Swiss-Prot record:
One of its GO terms (molecular function) is rRNA binding. This is Large ribosomal subunit protein uL6. The lineage of its organism: Bacteria, Pseudomonadati, Pseudomonadota, Gammaproteobacteria, Lysobacterales. GO terms for biological process: cytoplasmic translation. The gene is rplF. Keywords: Ribonucleoprotein, Ribosomal protein, RNA-binding, rRNA-binding. PROSITE patterns: RIBOSOMAL_L6_1 (PS00525). Belongs to the universal ribosomal protein uL6 family. Part of the 50S ribosomal subunit. Gene3D superfamilies: Ribosomal protein L6, alpha-beta domain. This protein binds to the 23S rRNA, and is important in its secondary structure. It is located near the subunit interface in the base of the L7/L12 stalk, and near the tRNA binding site of the peptidyltransferase center. HAMAP family: Ribosomal_uL6_B. One of its GO terms (cellular component) is cytosolic large ribosomal subunit. It comes from Stenotrophomonas maltophilia (strain K279a).
Length: 174
């Protein structure tokens, strides 16, 4: 079995419910579920979950399922967040109820409606915080917001992740 799949998952305060075709993780931040592939066994005892398989073809998939399960457990207990920064003159973000209104240099404000399970907030006018229990959805929402105005390489203007480094280019010499 793969090294990732062998590592046990510490559940903590999360309740893991394993059926024949699905796995459900329930915690303080919500509930997430996963369709369990056939041939992979998930055992839960004493607050620790372990995965195993008899089929040699499913070894790689077992490691993938273990990583997804681990992210589900972390998501329903602590949650995930992604921070975005707006760089540029006049670039601003503001909340209008549950919707995010972005001024990104277009002739109109861009309004983004957050999907269910995602919380958007703006600590400052140039910062956006995306929070939620599902790691994949949090990353997807952050990528959609970033796609409205990707950072350009000459001045670095646009929407970027807080930990992203923009590689700069030099302007053409006349």
């Amino acid at each position: 079995m793969s090294r990732v799949a062998k590592k046990p998952i510490d559940l903590g305060k999360v309740e893991l419910n394993v059926q024949s075709d699905s796995v459900t993780a329930k915690g303080p931040k919500g509930t997430l579920s996963l369709a369990k592939p056939a041939g992979i066994a998930i055992n839960v005892d004493n607050g620790v979950a372990t995965l195993s398989t008899e089929n040699a073809d499913l070894v790689a998939l077992t490691g993938t399922v273990r990583a997804i399960l681990s992210n589900m457990v972390k998501g329903v207990s602590e949650g995930f967040e992604r921070k975005l920064e707006l760089v540029g003159v006049g670039y601003r973000a503001a909340m209008q109820g549950k919707d995010l209104s972005l001024s990104l240099g277009f002739s109109h404000p861009v309004v983004f409606v957050a999907p269910e399970g995602i919380t958007l907030s703006t600590p400052t006018q140039t910062e956006i915080l995306v929070q939620g229990a599902d790691k994949q959805v949090v990353g997807e929402v952050a990528a959609k917001i970033r796609a409205f105005r990707k950072p350009e390489p000459y001045k670095g203007k646009g929407v970027k992740y807080s930990d992203e480094v923009i590689i700069r280019k030099e302007a053409k010499k006349a």
